[in-house]
Amino acid sequence: MEPDVIPAKNLVFGSGPECPTELLCLPLLRARYGLTFKEFRVTDAGGPRTVDALEAGEIQVGVLFTTDPRLLAGDFVLLEDDRHAQPAESVTPILRDELRAAHGEHLAASIDALSAELTTERLAELNRRVLLGASAAAVAAEFLTKRRHGLTPPTPRRNQPAIVVGSANFAESVTVAELYAHALAGAGFLVERRLGIGNRDTYFPLLRDGTVGLVPEYVGSLLAYLDGSRGSISDPPQAHAVLAQALQGTGLVALQPAPAQNKNGIVVTASTAAHYGLTKISDLGRAIGEPDGNG
């Protein structure tokens, strides 16, 4: 291979039809990494058409979400976002403040302990099991049993309002909501479920008005929803601090975020990664044989 070959210029990029103009897709790769690809082909936004196109060699670079269970098999390589272009998307519980006041800090502590265990890889594995046909409730119960969150003898909690756990209408959100519900029930709280409500425009007003008390969220996406100008922070602790500030006066509070993040991931096949020596996104714009600047 000639040493001046720039991988991106030889590779076809595929994603959903909005990618050429979506700020977090091709425009971000151009602005932060200076990448120009040989061609763009429409597939889908992190779904099966992208996977099929990668496997068939119709595209060599695509976008999958970082908690996609198909990243666990080893057929694809998730390139490191070494310039921190993508916003933080930590999985973050959003709770009605009145519930925290009514139930005390034990409620938040029960969810925080769970969140601390929820890594990107573990969430991808939960997603894999649901994709293979297991119920979200069963997957959540097994996860918590193994880690014993909320499964020690609970303290009876009488005369306190039920905690209504809600979720968006996609599988991962339902699974994380089931984790919350099982953790709280195991800790002695009365729990009701309202899962698969709809998109953020549908479920977030229900959280605001108290119909729902707790939902899983993604910090960057929620910040963009609340205030688009603040939805592009890549550092998770900073993003959480800004979200906490944005929620002041709303009656809502962001509990501790999980290490798990579900954000756009730039993916190549393992064979493409090996051929060009790709481990991080900046490698796509670096001439083969050129030092990477890290030593």
Model-identified regions with their sequence ranges:
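A conserved helix-loop-strand patch within extracytoplasmic ligand-binding domains
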Residues: 1-12, 96-100, 115-120, 237-295
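Ligand-binding cleft/hinge of the Venus flytrap
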Residues: 2-40, 142, 180-188, 281-295
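Short, well-ordered beta-strand elements
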Residues: 8-15, 158-173, 189-194, 292-295
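Short helix-initiation/N-cap motifs at beta->coil->alpha
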Residues: 17, 38-52, 192-205
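An extracytoplasmic/periplasmic, membrane-proximal ligand-sensing/linker region
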Residues: 18-28, 35, 90, 105-163, ...
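Periplasmic-binding protein-like
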Residues: 44, 67-115, 241, 249-253, ...
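A ligand-binding cleft/hinge motif common to bilobed small-molecule-binding domains
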Residues: 52-79, 216-243
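Extracytoplasmic small-molecule ligand-binding "clamshell" domains
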Residues: 172-218
